[in-house]
């Protein structure tokens, strides 16, 4: 009985999470759940809009990685690598600037998520080893994604969320890591 109740609860939580997500077009319109092309996802439960990664080379290419830099703090004054499609300025500040300039889904206030925000889309009850709903977030890598949060005791590090076990951990800001941007829907 207890086992059935636990399984029912987990299934309800998983279905509830999915019901709260909606796909958005590149212009910011809500589109059908079965659409095969979308650029953002709105999570109605958290009132957050998330960037969706692409399998095509470009600014939102899923394989692009970035060093962490916000223009105010960081390490080596914004050191960047060349692990993004355009091959220059591959740090988080430049990526955010490029996405805001392009007005992804009609908005220009994209940013790195907090630890709690990024953990809110971790799906511990899904059907794959990747801890995210790939029906809404395809092309997500089984790796870590930067948050906006620096480590207080060591400002040369920032927190990241690994989508292979959840939670968060600290990483040196000069190490290339994946990025998924967010904005408030309010």
Where are these regions (language model features)?
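Hydrophobic h-region of N-terminal signal peptides that target proteins for export
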Residues: 10-18
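Glycine-aromatic-enriched surface loops/turns that form tight recognition elements
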Residues: 5, 17-111, 115-186
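Sec-dependent signal peptide recognition
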Residues: 2-8
């Amino acid at each position: 009985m207890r086992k059935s109740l636990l399984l029912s609860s987990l299934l309800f939580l998983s279905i509830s999470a999915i019901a709260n997500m909606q796909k958005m077009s590149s212009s910011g319109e809500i589109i059908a759940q079965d659409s095969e092309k979308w650029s953002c996802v709105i999570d109605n439960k958290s009132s957050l809009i998330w960037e969706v990664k692409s399998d095509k080379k470009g600014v939102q290419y899923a394989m692009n990685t970035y060093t962490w830099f916000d223009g105010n703090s960081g390490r080596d004054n914004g050191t960047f690598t060349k692990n993004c499609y355009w091959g220059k300025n591959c740090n988080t500040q430049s990526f955010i600037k490029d996405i805001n300039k392009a007005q992804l889904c009609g908005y220009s206030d994209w940013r790195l998520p907090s630890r709690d925000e990024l953990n809110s889309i971790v799906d511990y009850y899904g059907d794959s080893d990747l801890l995210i709903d790939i029906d809404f977030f395809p092309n997500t890598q089984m790796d870590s994604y930067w948050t906006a949060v620096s480590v207080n005791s060591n400002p040369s590090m920032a927190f990241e969320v690994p989508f292979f076990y959840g939670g968060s951990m600290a990483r040196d800001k000069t190490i290339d890591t994946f990025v998924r941007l967010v904005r408030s829907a309010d």
